[in-house]
Amino acid sequence: MTGIRAQLWIVAFGFFMQTLDTTIVNTALPSMAASLGENPLRMQSVIVSYVLTVAVMLPASGWLADRVGVKWVFFSAIILFTLGSLLCAQAETLNELISSRVIQGIGGAMMVPVGRLTVMKIVPREQYMSAMAFVTLPGQIGPLVGPALGGFLVEYASWHWIFLINLPVGVVGALATLWLMPNYTTRTRRFDISGFIMLAIGMATLTLALDGHKGLGLPPLAIAGLILCGILALAGYWWHAKGNSSALFTLRLFNNKSYSLGLIGSMSARIGSGMLPFMTPVFLQIGLGFTPFHAGLMMIPMIIGSMGMKRIIVRVVNRFGYRRVLVSATLLLAVVSLSFPLVALMGWTLLLPIVLFFQGMLNALRFSTMNTLALKDLPNRLASSGNSLLSMVMQLSMSLGVSTAGILLGVFAHNQVVTNTPATHSAFLYSYICMAIIIALPALIFNRVPADTGTNRNLPRASAKAANR
């Protein structure tokens, strides 16, 4: 194995660990709740803590890699992720599990962006597409096997193993990084620590406020304090960034209409879409009485639909345009999402994989189109900052979505659920109705996309062949 090929394998395993962990936990939440003696309706904090940490730490990852070197940052990311996994497996209370997920999230936040940067450093630019296709393939496999693997481990072993399986991969990856990966550094500008702290406080406090009453049991006064603190922190960042060329994210990004619409639309849309991976396995297990493994297998059609749609997205957008694709996909996703509990509660369980397949297709169509809309017209000097802000907003909105789903289910179930009962069915149905409305609302934003927004081109055949080697 050549040196470069070995280094690409290291990055690929990092991608696999991170993407696997984003999906493997969802199926295990009801079993975790039973083991820890917790209400299943409080378990969304296990997901929120991880995703929110990733969102907060993302802006610092690229700067750290440039300053300290990709080798040491990637090594530290793997160590933190592996240590967090070990602590998660040893957790005996929900608070211990949440704290361990924060450690995991710090490692996960650095793993993927630093991995991309590593690939840029170790391969010639003309081979970058082929190299990225190689390292991201395991990352595509992670979400495909994650739900089923998580369900299998929970059903036939225990939920602790969804974290313990990271240990051997992490140890091998860390040793391989020390042995094989070169340490590239780059001269960097001074890091905007003030802006970073204000954004981190704003994101964390507002998300905690949303999750505070149902998930954390905070009193109303504490929640009001968190909201006020979050608003002041974000307002402070806005004031700090005005006319500041060294700000973490320049406000000049919002002078670009496509970027503004894409970013705002992406955040609002991902709040709705972020509810689905959390609610689906919980509904299947608590609402319908499925086993964890069965619920995990049911998630596979959604991933297959998502992967299949990615192959034809460019043709669909070129044929119908950004505005029509985004508005139509958003409204259709709302309808399909609401049809999922309706089909299930009418007893047509054989149709559920088909519904989930279309849900995955529509999600992929909307995600890819939103991302392209946001970045396609940015000038080169703003591309890096714009992409980093978009990545952060994507993670933040997912955490907000999971928190919102947990709140809805807690409100309609009155914080008590019994598996596969009429009262539980009603709670899930009302929650899905609200989710469908939230999913549909971003269509109002996407309807403002100019009708003449430009088209896209497929990759040349030669490049496509290179990417598939």
Swiss-Prot record:
Topology of the protein relative to the lipid bilayer: Multi-pass membrane protein
Pfam families associated with the record: MFS_1
Gene3D superfamilies, A to Z: MFS general substrate transporter like domains (1.20.1250.20), Multidrug resistance protein D (1.20.1720.10)
GO terms of molecular function: transmembrane transporter activity
Cellular location(s): Cell inner membrane
Signal peptide: none
TM region positions: 8-28, 45-65, 68-88, 102-122, 134-154, 161-181, 191-211, 215-235, 263-283, 286-306, 338-358, 392-412, 426-446
GO cellular component terms given for this protein: plasma membrane
UniProt entry keywords in alphabetical sequence: Cell inner membrane, Cell membrane, Membrane, Transmembrane, Transmembrane helix, Transport
Source organism superkingdom: Bacteria
Main location: membrane
Cited InterPro entries: MFS (IPR011701), MFS_dom (IPR020846), MFS_trans_sf (IPR036259), Multi-R_MdtD (IPR023721)
Disulfide bonds: none
Family, per entry: Belongs to the major facilitator superfamily. TCR/Tet family.
PANTHER family documented for this protein: BLR6921 PROTEIN (PTHR42718:SF46), MAJOR FACILITATOR SUPERFAMILY MULTIDRUG TRANSPORTER MFSC (PTHR42718)
HAMAP family, sorted: MFS_MdtD (MF_01577)
Name under which the protein is recorded: Putative multidrug resistance protein MdtD
Species in which this protein is naturally found: Yersinia enterocolitica serotype O:8 / biotype 1B (strain NCTC 13174 / 8081)
